[in-house]
């Protein structure tokens, strides 16, 4: 059987985005622009984040947490007692039905006295954490990782802004530590023998899937994953495999970027192939603040005019998350 063709996913050295050399930054921006208008994906290399430590700490957490602890941390979709946990917490596997499981946490600055927590603004939650005695150092590591990947994402947003002919802070001015709605999700895809048939979906083309086609609900997504190829991107000739790289971050635009650029930078449609191997998928969904709104424009037109209406990030995120669950089910 012939192997699936590989998608063009370039490796882009993003280190200039942390510096002051505008000529070098523009080289990165041009590479981001080309990737965004091709498959929609690129690998960010020389990103400055210790991904091996991330992988090791995540594996340690996944293999040490008990079923009882998972239940105590479970989001409302699984544990009805946790009415305030819509996004943050543990997403359970379900025997014979669902194999994947994950732990999601939000902005560490969302503490009980945060104004947007106090006002019960939707999509804002206080994180829940496992017992420090049972998982020493995990919370400290996880919160620090949030800010590490936040810093990388800020640099990437500067690159996207330059790629679109805007000022460097065009996106990052809306991406603030005090109120960004970004999330880290530590996803575990386990090896199971036997693997429950009900946990495997089948696409129209016969491909076995773990998660069906979708666009990301984000401005951009910054993903670390194991060295196990699993993602496919839809192109005119069909779905193409994305090669894995466990030293780099896989970056793509979400549907908010597609909306505000009139689809000049589309959100690539992609899916997760079923692979019965132990692996990690650790996305950072780059989300702006609830009240932030980026005015849509069309970069392909000299006057930039578009019929796309402005939408606040909070409204976009609420609607997008609900739509994704309705389409593909609870993750």
UniProtKB/Swiss-Prot annotation:
Binds 1 Fe(2+) ion per subunit. Induction: Expression is repressed by glucose. The transcription factor rfx1 controls penicillin biosynthesis through the regulation of the acvA, ipnA and aatA transcription. Expression is also controlled by the transcription factor pacC that specifically recognizes the 5'-GCCARG-3' sequence in the promoter. Its EC number is 1.21.3.1. GO terms for biological process: penicillin biosynthetic process. 2-oxoglutarate binds at residue 279. GO terms for molecular function: dioxygenase activity; iron ion binding. It catalyses: N-[(5S)-5-amino-5-carboxypentanoyl]-L-cysteinyl-D-valine + O2 = isopenicillin N + 2 H2O. InterPro entries: DIOX_N, IPNS-like_FE2OG_OXY, IPNS-like_sf, Isopenicillin-N_synth_CS, Oxoglu/Fe-dep_dioxygenase_dom. It is found in: Cytoplasm, Cytosol. Its cofactor is Fe(2+). GO terms for cellular component: cytosol. Keywords: Antibiotic biosynthesis, Cytoplasm, Dioxygenase, Iron, Metal-binding, Oxidoreductase. Belongs to the iron/ascorbate-dependent oxidoreductase family. Isopenicillin N synthase; part of the gene cluster that mediates the biosynthesis of penicillin, the world's most important antibiotic. The first step of the pathway is performed by the trimodular NRPS acvA that produces the tripeptide N-[(5S)-5-amino-5-carboxypentanoyl]-L-cysteinyl-D-valine (LLD-ACV or ACV) via condensation of the 3 residues L-2-aminoadipate, L-cysteine and L-valine. The precursor amino acids for penicillin biosynthesis are withdrawn from the vacuolar amino acid pool by the MFS-type transporter penV. This is Isopenicillin N synthase. The lineage of its organism: Eukaryota, Fungi, Dikarya, Ascomycota, Pezizomycotina.
